[in-house]
Amino acid sequence: MLEKMFKLKENNTTAKTEVIAGITTFMTMAYILAVNPNLLSQAGMDPTAVLIATCLASFIGTFAMALLANYPFALAPGMGLNAYFAFTVCGNMGYSWKVALMAVFFEGIIFIILSLTNVREAIFNAIPTTLKKGVSAGIGLFIAFIGLQGGHIVVNNDSTLLSYVNFRDNWHTEGICAVLALIGLLLTAILYIKKVKGSILIGILATWILGMICQAAGVYRIDADAGFYSLYPTFAMTDFSKIGETFGQCFTADFHGVGIMNFIVVKLSFLFVDMFDTIGTLIGVSDKAGMLDEDGKLPNVKQALMADAIATSAGAVLGTSTTTTFVESSAGVGAGARTGLASIVTGLLFLLAIFFAPIFTAIPGFATAPALIFVGFLMVSAIVKVDFEDLTDAVPAYLCLIAMPLMYSIAEGIAIGVISFVLINLICGKRKKITPLMYILAVLFICKYIFL
């Protein structure tokens, strides 16, 4: 049955590999169960309700991806989009969270229409192959940077923006976390090189267990004010009645005092970031998995984009910010995921997480950091496929690559890559390389920087 539904042999994988990879993806994404409720609660939403909505939206989106597209991509409320929801729309603009949810719902509906009319598929296919390699490598650097932050290996510095962690001054918090993350990275790399099945998942679990041992020995110390909590999982149950506080509330939004133009700007902002984050993630992860054809196209991209659109609208109704395809899916791909069976496993774990949320939210950032850093390395390898003899191809790919981690946005990296590709090739007399849709995208990106 599994073979017929997911074509395991055709994709050179096994059920065991897919299950392990699906668990790996979930483990690297589990932080969203802690982060999303925390962020959206600052917009006035009930954190338990947001937690349940996050689990359900992730389950729906990931299952849709598995059943519609048969791809090992997992979905959840997107980082960055949830911060924009809480701090910009509900914070600086002063709108209620119900109005913000309505904007997300409309964005999802627009995406469904765009997916049905092949617009999003056309955008995906219009991006040149060389730029897709830059996107893939850029995402690798981006998730490696996220891992370095989560592992407390790089920390904030007022003078240089970033610096290496000071082990001596913060040994019992940041220091020991960074050491554990580095040990986990070394362990993951060795296991992967030795071709041990589930090496990335083993790395996550081993690092977490080492952390709990350090807490028991007094080496790791809890400092809640600084964001360092107990590493032991708890077994409290979730209050399911809370979901009523967010479910369907987007339809009760009071638009009194909400300017139509401001609402359109909010909707377009959600639309822009979600669209190109998703396209960028699909390019990067599918390239790493070897799913792109000779022309750089993804066979079932229309179905994948439809799953993403459905998840966004469903998430808004349930009570969470924009649901999107997660770049952490690359961790599962690195562990061998090639079909929707891995997504089924990840989706089921999100559903189960509703009942055991405190256990999954106990997974610390330093435990998932090795997975993100190592998978980042695997994805950066795509850059070797860029033709560095043709600078009109290489320079845009390079700009795209460095923009993603430095601007902390996949969408911004794609924007910089598209604009630079069009301008460089246009000015250098290589207009035949530029498709009409690339011209349109470049103009839209430039307008976005001017007006949004």
Descriptions of predicted regions:
Residues 1-49, 165-169, 204-302, 445-447:
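Helix-loop-helix hairpins and the membrane-proximal interhelical loops
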Residues 2-36, 57, 78-87, 91-139, ...:
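Helix-loop-helix junctions within the multi-pass membrane cores of secondary transporters/permeases
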Residues 19, 39, 123, 198, ...:
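Residue-level signature of catalytic and energy-coupling elements of molecular machines
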Residues 41, 66, 70, 74, ...:
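Transmembrane helix-loop junctions in multipass membrane proteins, especially transporters and channels
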Residues 44-63:
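Loop-to-helix transition at the N-terminal end of transmembrane alpha-helices
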Residues 47-48, 73, 97, 410:
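Membrane-helix interface/capping residues of multi-pass secondary transporters
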Residues 61-73, 189-195, 269-277, 308-318, ...:
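Transmembrane alpha-helix interface/packing and boundary motifs in multi-pass membrane proteins
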Residues 93-209, 213, 344-452:
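Membrane-embedded alpha-helical modules
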